[in-house]
Amino acid sequence: LRAADPGDFGGPVEVRGWVKTVRAQKGVSFVELGDGSSVGGLQAVLNPGSEGWGLLADGRVATGASVRVQGELVASPAKGQAVELKASALELLGASPENYPLQKKRHSLEFLRERAHLRPRTNLGGAVARVRSALAFATHEFFHGQGFVGVNTPLISTSDCEGAGEMFQVTTLLPE
């Protein structure tokens, strides 16, 4: 969704993401999609003739559902976004439970800590992921430019989980 801009007009596109909101007005449905790659989502516009319209009509596509939408990017006539997806097909990849806890409102950090598996779907979780990605990329790029070689070292853990391993001593001192 991050790359959706007016330069992509024309030709078919396919996007996948989580449903942030669903609105129905005058025989047209608007589905806002998000995938964490940008702060804003992408609005998909579906007409009653669109494949998958029944999924909206019977309420199976709701906030939190994962979907695949095919269509064409067009200039948005409404304010608030530069482009929208004129959808030709909507496919439900994963339904959301009726008691899906994330809604449009802002949630406290404590609320999100209790639902860590849903944190990446929030604006905050997506922003943190994008910042971490940019920082990791910049760090690697800097050190690569300075002639360093990246090495992924093995991890040494201090815990013996359920007796599955054998403990041993690690020291930085050289034996005499």
Spans of features found by a protein language model:
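Class II aminoacyl-tRNA synthetase catalytic cores and aaRS-like
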Residues: L1-E176
